[in-house]
Regions:
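Residues forming the flavin
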Residues: 1-79, 118-122, 127-451, 455-575
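A contiguous, well-ordered beta/alpha segment that forms the leading edge of an enzyme domain
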Residues: 76-88
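Long, well-ordered early-domain segments
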Residues: 85-129
Length: 575
C-alpha cells in the first residue's frame, strides 16, 4: 500500500482504472466509459481475456428477456426461492437482489451498445432443477459466435480457448452445438461435418492461423467486448501487472503497476475496479486456505491467477470470505498443455464409474462438477484414498465417447494415442484386476463396484448415489442407453482408467463486497474508491454453483453495477 497525502501521485490519470481483462473487467470498463468516465484497463498477461477466454462463456441470468419468446417462464420470486434454497446460509439478500435486478439490464445494455449478443439455452437446466424455483433451461445464456477477423491485430493477443472446447483441438462449437454432438442428437453427424468443412475451407484464414475464425464460448465473449473497447478508444495495457493500490489516506486513488520493467503510478480519480481473478496459481495461498491436498498444477484455470487483487485488498484492511472454497471441477493432465482439462461432461455417460484407491465410489458421477469435488474431499478426509481418483470405463465407452484427452475410439483408435501416453496418461488392461494393479486400486473393491454398477444399468436406478436421477444428470447422458441415459454395463475389455485430480476453474474466496461491489472491511465499513468482482471477490453464490454461468454472470453484472455506482458517486461529488 502507498499513502500520499500531498495529492501528487500518478504518472497518468484516469477516472477509473480496471485491473484485469476478463468479461467482468471489460463490462465494467465499457459501462463506466458510457457513463462519461475516462477508463484504463491493465492486464498482467501478454494476452487478454483472463479465465473467461478459456471458459464456456455462459452467463446465468434468471428472468432474461428471451425466456418467454422461447416458450419458457421465470419470475423474480422463483429465482429468489431457488437461490435461497441452494445458496443456503451464505444467502446475502442485498447482493442477490442486486444481481437479479441488474443481470437482465446488463445483457440488454451490451446487446444495444456493444458487439456482445447472448442466446438463451433452452434445455440447459439449472444444476439443481428439482429444488424449489429450479428451471429446466433458459436461464443460461451463451455468447453468439464472433468473427475473429473483426478484431484485426487484437486477435493475436486474445487468450486461446481451451482445446477441450474444440473439435480436434481446432474447430469451435457453441454450447448448443456441443450438446447436440456429444449427446448424439438427431442431425449431430451432419452438424459436425458442416463445422469441420467450414473450418477446412476457410483458406484465407488458415494462412494466418490454425485457430478457428468463428469464435465461440468464452473466446467469443471476450472478443466481442474487446471490439467494443476498441470502438470506444478505451486503452488496454497488456504485460502491466498491478503491484499495489495507492491511497490518499482516506480513499483508494490509484494503482502502482509495472510497465516496461519499472514502477508506474496511475491515478484513478473516481475508483479502482479489481477484476483480476482468484489465487489458483498461488501455491502459498492454496496451502494457507484450501482443503488438503491441493496443488496449483491441478487447476484448469490460466496460470496467471495468483491472488494479486485479493492480496492488495488485504493490505488495505479488506475483509475476505469463502477462502476455503473453489469452483471445483475434476481435472486430468494433458502432456504439453499449461493447465489441466476439466472433466465436465464425460462423467455423465454410461459405462463408466469414478472410484478411489479402495475401488469404491464416493459420488454421483453425473453431479454438478463442484459437488464432485466436495464429495471427493469429504470422503478423502475419512479414507485418505480419494486423491487422486480414477475414472474407469470399458471398450464400448472408449469407442463411443470423448474422454478428457481422447476423442472417441471410433475417431481416434488406440493406435493413434500419442506415444508415451498409454500407462502414463491413459491406462489400459485386458481385465479389471490387471487395470487395478496398474493404477494402485484395490482389485476386489473395484470388482464389487463394477458389479453393482452393472446391476444399476439393468434396472436404471442407482440406489447408492442416484446417477441419472434428474434433468441435469441426464443432460450429457446418452439417450440411446436405456432405461437410464447415464448408466450402462462396464463389461467389454479392454478396460481403461484416467487419473482424476481435484481441480477447479477458479477459487471462490476473495474480498468481501456489498451490493454495489464496494470492498468492505471486517467491521462492514466501505473502503472508499475500491471495487471488486469476479473471482477477486467472495462469490455471491456462496459455497454453491446454482447453474451454468454462475461465475461469469455475476462478474459481468457486478462490473455493470460497480460502474454505475462510480458514475453516480461522481455526480454526487459535483452537486
Amino acid at each position: 500500500m502507498h499513502d500520499d497525502r500531498h495529492d501528487s501521485f500518478g504518472d497518468a490519470t484516469y477516472d477509473v482504472v480496471v485491473v484485469g481483462s476478463g468479461a467482468g473487467a471489460m463490462t465494467a470498463a465499457l459501462r463506466a466509459h458510457d457513463q462519461g468516465l475516462s477508463v484504463l484497463v491493465v492486464e498482467k498477461s501478454t494476452v487478454y481475456g483472463g479465465t473467461t477466454a478459456v471458459s464456456g462463456g455462459g452467463i446465468w441470468i434468471p428472468c432474461n428477456d428471451q425466456i418467454a419468446a422461447l416458450g419458457g417462464s421465470d419470475s423474480y420470486d422463483e429465482a429468489i426461492m431457488y437461490l435461497r434454497d441452494v445458496v443456503g446460509e451464505d444467502f446475502d439478500a442485498r447482493r442477490i437482489d442486486a444481481y437479479l435486478d441488474n443481470g437482465p439490464k446488463m445483457v440488454a445494455y451490451l446487446a444495444k451498445h456493444a458487439h456482445t449478443r447472448f442466446n438463451a439455452v433452452p434445455r440447459y437446466p439449472d444444476y439443481y432443477p428439482d429444488r424449489k424455483g429450479g428451471k429446466p433451461g433458459y436461464r443460461t445464456m451463451e455468447p453468439a459466435p464472433f468473427d475473429a477477423a473483426r478484431l484485426g491485430a487484437h486477435f493475436d493477443t486474445l487468450r486461446a480457448p481451451s482445446p477441450a472446447t474444440l473439435i480436434g483441438g481446432r474447430i469451435a462449437m457453441t454450447q448448443i452445438e456441443a450438446h447436440t454432438i456429444l449427446a448424439k442428437e438427431r442431425g449431430w453427424l451432419r452438424l459436425a461435418a458442416r463445422l469441420m468443412l467450414r473450418y477446412a475451407t476457410d483458406f484465407k484464414w488458415r494462412r494466418r492461423t490454425p485457430r478457428d475464425r468463428r469464435l465461440t464460448l468464452g473466446n467469443a465473449l471476450v472478443a466481442s467486448l474487446r471490439a467494443a473497447l476498441e470502438q470506444r478508444g478505451i486503452a488496454l495495457w497488456l504485460a502491466t501487472p498491478m503491484r499495489s493500490l495507492h491511497t490518499d489516506g482516506a480513499r483508494v486513488n490509484g494503482v502502482v503497476v509495472e510497465r516496461d520493467g519499472r514502477p508506474f503510478g496511475i491515478r484513478a480519480t473516481h475508483g479502482v475496479v479489481l477484476a483480476c481473478g482468484g489465487f489458483e496459481a498461488n501455491q502459498a495461498m492454496r496451502d494457507q486456505y484450501l482443503p488438503k491436498p491441493t496443488r496449483a498444477e491441478w487447476s484448469a484455470a490460466p496460470p496467471i491467477n495468483t491472488g494479486d487483487g485479493i492480496r492488495a485488498g488485504l493490505a488495505l484492511g479488506a475483509d475476505v470470505a469463502l477462502m476455503g472454497f473453489v469452483w471445483g471441477v475434476p481435472t486430468v493432465r494433458v502432456p504439453g498443455e499449461e493447465k489441466q482439462r476439466g472433466l465436465f461432461v464425460e462423467r455423465s455417460a454410461p459405462r463408466c464409474v469414478m472410484v478411489n484407491r479402495l475401488g469404491r465410489r464416493f459420488v454421483n458421477e453425473s453431479a454438478p462438477y463442484p459437488d464432485v469435488i466436495h464429495a471427493m474431499y469429504a470422503d478423502h478426509a475419512n479414507t485418505q484414498a480419494n486423491v487422486p481418483a480414477w475414472l474407469i470405463f470399458d471398450a464400448e465407452y472408449r469407442k463411443r465417447y470423448p474422454c478428457g484427452v481422447l476423442l472417441p475410439g471410433s475417431v481416434q483408435p488406440d493406435s493413434r494415442i500419442p506415444p508415451g501416453w498409454l500407462d502414463s496418461v491413459i491406462y489400459r488392461a485386458g481385465s479389471l484386476a490387471e487395470l487395478a494393479a496398474k493404477i494402485g486400486v484395490d482389485a476386489q473393491g473395484l470388482a464389487q463396484t463394477v458389479e453393482r454398477m452393472n446391476g444399476y444399468a439393468l434396472t436404471g436406478i442407482d440406489t447408492e448415489f442416484g446417477k441419472g436421477g434428474n434433468l441435469f444428470d441426464r443432460y450429457y447422458g446418452d439417450s440411446s442407453s436405456k432405461p437410464n441415459p447415464c448408466l450402462g454395463p462396464i463389461e467389454r475389455a479392454p478396460f481403461y482408467a484416467l487419473r482424476v485430480d481435484p481441480g477447479e476453474i477458479g477459487t471462490k474466496g476473495g474480498l468481501r463486497t456489498d451490493a454495489h461491489a464496494r470492498v468492505l472491511r471486517s467491521d462492514g465499513s466501505v473502503i472508499d474508491g475500491l471495487y471488486a468482482l469476479g473471482n477477486t471477490s467472495a462469490a455471491v453464490m456462496g459455497k454453491t454453483y446454482p447453474g451454468p454461468g454462475s461465475t461469469i454472470g455475476p462478474a459481468m453484472t457486478f462490473g455493470y453495477v460497480a460502474a454505475d455506482h462510480i458514475a453516480a458517486a461522481r455526480s454526487d461529488r459535483f452537486l
